[in-house]
Amino acid sequence: MPETNSSHAHRLFAIENAQEIYSGKLGAESLGVTTQDDYTIVFRLAAPCPDFLERLTECEFMPCNEDFFNAMGGRYGLGNKYMLCNGPFYVSAWDPKTSLTIKANKFYSGASKAKPSSVIFSFDPSAESISKKLTAGSLGAAFLSPDAPQPENTVTVSESVNSSFGFVFNCANALMSNKELRLALCSSIDRSLFGSKGSNIAPQSGLVPRSCSAGGVNYRESVGSQTPAIQYDAAAAATHWKNALSQLGEDKLTFTVLCPSWVEEQVRRQLQIWQQIMGIGLGVTVVTATADEINAAIAAGNYQVALTGIDSPYESAVDFLASFSDGGIFAFSGNEYSDIIKRLMGVDTDGELLSGCLTAENYLLGNAVCYPLYERSSRFVTSKDVDGVYMNGSESTVCFIYAKRYD
């Protein structure tokens, strides 16, 4: 429903009328889902969806007890008192701001009994704070973003190249909403300034991270040399700049670039190139900030240009690209991109899925909403005194039923 504002709603859009219901054009009774009998549910799709059976395994499709749902008076799932759990664990406490606690279910009759008596999930958006807690031993395991330092006394269980890092433009900003200005900036970025910065980072021009797949194959490897990129072209940049000034009715433009300190030197060199091409009519201020500060500014829409990571919690390239349908990190919106994603959701073959993803990626990069520079890895780490915790694929799947912590 529209009022849920769910970031995962697009996973259901393959169902007949789901997207129209979410946009408020139709009522919930129009959804293409019916029951044939007590044990059979029927889904009518708006168009063929190659990975629909896989989607049915995800939390968005989890069934619930109807009597219990109705008894909750509209608060189902909003707290531990409004949940019905029948797995190896049950939710015993939940503070949406700080943590969620689950305990072993002594009535569970499945074959696999839970080894830990309880597990606490701590909510912390700060990469620096998470690293400190792991070092101090107050966390047993965590996902570390590419910005987080490797904590002491931890073991890296797995890595995932799930982040693209580069220039991001706030398309909701009065200046950066101008496509000609964004094209002027992107077509005059000297990629050679931004060499490799360490073991956790490598040059990359595509937006979709290497962790994403499409049509059963790795998307980044499959598109290969077709990876889109805006090429350096000083003459074209100068033309775009003149067009931007004309469209904005200005003879001078000033804006601010937020960046982490480790890339400040390169950004300042890039600033010199921009000023050489665009002249004295361009004024740019470079402000350094921590990754947490930059993320907070982006979340609040309080920025113009930022160098930051664009992380994917998804294994699917389709889901990653669809997450920008409502503007996403770029605050870029338009019916044309929404239509591209809608068509992508309804393709028949794996080949069409790949080409559709490439079309969507090309559209975003061609509109200069961002300029990727690097690919980066997130890590799943555990404390050295923790065993039996591992992840499957993306950050959405972690197994801890056999977890142990040694004193």
Regions found by a protein language model. Name each.
Residues S199-A244, V263-Q266:
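Structural transition elements
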Residues K242-G309:
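Ligand/substrate-recognition segments at binding pockets and active sites
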Residues T382-D407:
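Long beta-strand-rich cores associated with HINT superfamily self-processing modules
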Residues M1-A14, L175-S177:
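Aromatic- and charge-enriched surface segment that lines or borders ligand/interaction sites
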Residues F107-Q150:
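Ligand-site clamp/hinge motif
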